[in-house]
């Protein structure tokens, strides 16, 4: 089994994923933009091989790394990372190299957008918090948000609908905090409010 692991060293304490794959007999093929020497020893010893690219943002370079590994080790069975940021890169690699496991670009939105995840949970019968997606914060969106706050009460949690981790997450616990959020939220970033 060949596992292409993007940025295998990040976060540093997640090397266990690579180590356990290796223990199961997998070739763990790392692609990253960090110098090999800077990767923790636990991660380095878990990798079969590491291919350094100038930047993981350079899809062509990552694609060439995957092609190199395929030429050397055979078909890639899994493309993984431990960083939500690389979901689109993983999906494109799966599509380009016909990897049968994992999300492809066409179905990536179901796991990338919090509002779409909630729709999936609801279809599966999993209860979720009531929510509102706010695309921009013009007068109509501000009014809808204030109405949502009146109906649901405080506190509300606001976070980017498409975002990594808890970055730019707000706890709104009063009408004054809601007013501040409306005034400061970037117009171009869709937010999900729960």
Over which residues does each language-model region extend?
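ATP-binding N-terminal substructure of ATP-dependent carboxylate-amine bond-forming enzymes
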Residues: 1-106, 138-139
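Short amphipathic alpha-helical segments and helix-helix/interface helices
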Residues: 15-22, 118, 145-146, 179-182
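CheY-like receiver
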Residues: 65-69, 147-148, 181-184
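A general structural motif
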Residues: 25, 76, 151-155, 188
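Conserved ATP-binding module of the ATP-grasp superfamily
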Residues: 127-129, 155-158, 167-194
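Short acidic active-site motifs
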Residues: 61, 141-144, 177
């Amino acid at each position: 089994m060949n596992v292409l692991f993007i940025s295998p060293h990040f976060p540093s304490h997640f090397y266990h994923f690579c180590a356990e794959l290796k223990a199961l007999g997998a070739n763990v093929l790392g692609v990253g933009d960090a110098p090999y020497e800077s990767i923790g020893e636990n991660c380095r010893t878990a990798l079969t091989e590491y291919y350094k690219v100038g930047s993981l943002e350079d899809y062509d370079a990552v694609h060439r790394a995957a092609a190199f590994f395929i030429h050397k080790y055979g078909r890639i069975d899994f493309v993984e990372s431990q960083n939500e940021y690389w979901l689109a890169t993983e999906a494109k690699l799966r599509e380009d190299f016909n990897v049968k496991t994992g999300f492809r670009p066409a179905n990536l939105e179901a796991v990338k957008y919090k509002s779409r995840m909630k729709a999936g949970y609801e279809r599966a019968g999993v209860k979720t918090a009531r929510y509102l997606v706010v695309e921009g914060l013009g007068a109509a969106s501000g009014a809808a948000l204030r109405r949502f706050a009146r109906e649901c009460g405080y506190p509300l949690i606001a976070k980017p609908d498409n975002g990594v981790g808890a970055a730019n997450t707000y706890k709104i616990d009063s009408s004054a905090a809601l007013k501040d959020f409306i005034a400061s939220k970037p117009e171009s970033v869709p937010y999900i409010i729960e």
